[in-house]
Amino acid sequence: YTAALVSRLIAEGINFPHISGVSAGSSHLCNFTSRDAQRSHDTFVDLVEDPEFGGLKHFRKGHGYFNAEYIYQQICYPDGALPFNLDTFLANPAITRVATFNASRGEERWFSKEEMSTLDTLGPIIRASSTLPILMPPVEIDGDTYVDGALGPNGGLPFDQPLREGYRKLLVVLTRPRDFVKDPMPASVGALLRTAYRSFPSVFEGVALRTDRYNAGRRLLFELEERGQAYVFTPDN
């Protein structure tokens, strides 16, 4: 659903002065900014049929249940499965912001397009933003350990960044239905996180707090919508 929306926006020639993304949304950010509607489709539809995409075989090898290095780095190169148009991405005048979570420091970090000016730097950042704890191995960037940006203060709803930068009209794409409410983290997941990330307690804290942060973010977003400051897309189911 989200990939189809991104492809349609590109096909209609729609662009924005500021684009923020987190987790899977960071991949959408890249495809949208590079104006590649076909890659938007292929990344979220065809790629799952690739035997290198993931599975227990890759998980047992330490690559993650979703083979993150392949999905977010290897396929992007000219000889990869889905080459990325870096030149168009960089030429787009839009400001871009990708949310990640620095587990070493216990804080959110936003990366700009200027910090993703090569495929060697872009791939790890998008991978970090999308790295689901336990299911995917963490990413090292500049000596620090990174995981999914949804563990930050916005709970995975990155519309807070354009608001901080002064934007007052937003288009926001949500992946859950309008009436969705996130449930608290199960105790079993918490125990697993404490064990797997004992050296990074901020990961457990980020996941534990995400329910409240995410639900609060949705409430704020719908308030902005009521005030005419946000146009919100939600799936029917």
Residue map of PLM features:
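Patatin-like phospholipase
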Residues: 1-19, 30-237
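Catalytic nucleophile serine of serine hydrolases
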Residues: 23
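Active/ligand-binding-proximal structured segments within catalytic/core domains
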Residues: 26-28
